[in-house]
Design a protein with these regions (language model features):
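ADP-ribose/adenylate-binding Rossmann-like module
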Residues: 76-81, 87-112
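Hydrophobic, well-ordered beta-alpha structural blocks that scaffold small-molecule cofactor pockets
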Residues: 1-53
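Glycine-rich phosphate/adenylate-binding loop
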Residues: 2, 7, 72, 101-110, ...
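Short acidic/histidine-rich motifs immediately flanking catalytic phosphotransfer sites
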Residues: 56-57, 72-76
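Conserved SAM/SAH-binding loop
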Residues: 63-67
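Short alpha-helices
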Residues: 116-123
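Hydrophobic beta-strand scaffold residues
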Residues: 38, 60, 100-101
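A generic structural signal for well-ordered alpha-helical segments
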Residues: 53, 58, 90-94
């Protein structure tokens, strides 16, 4: 078994989300439901992310990612950009800093993965 299943309480945990497009939107929705304290780094973000960020007190850093953005204060980082090389670089930087990393759709370079979630109405 490569991955160890566990649930984590993200309330007040600092999470770094790198990316500002549709993939980042989906991850952001999950993080908000879990009450995580999210910081987003992206030179551009969708209007959806801007709206959600404003409503949920999420910090957006409108810059290109650099390794200087990584800080051990983050519980984990999610690389959700559309740039494969950048995502790999984020994974390498996170590993150097002993920060858990998820690179969307690249499980071979992730420390953890997000399982599929099936939501149903009230039973």
């Amino acid at each position: 078994m490569k991955y160890f299943p566990f649930y984590i309480d993200l309330k007040k945990k600092l999470v770094l989300l790198i990316g500002g497009g549709e993939v980042a939107e989906r991850k952001l929705d999950l993080l908000i439901k879990a009450k995580a304290n999210v910081t987003i780094i992206s030179p551009k973000t969708t209007s959806y992310i801007l709206d959600i960020a404003e409503k949920n007190n999420i910090k957006i850093i409108n810059e290109e990612y650099s390794s200087q953005h990584l800080d051990k204060k983050y519980s984990f980082v999610i690389a959700a950009t559309n740039n494969e090389e950048l995502n790999k670089s984020i994974a390498v930087d996170a590993n150097k800093n002993n920060i858990l990393v998820n690179v969307v759709d690249r499980p071979e370079i992730c420390d953890f993965i997000f399982p599929s979630i099936l939501e149903r109405g009230d039973i």
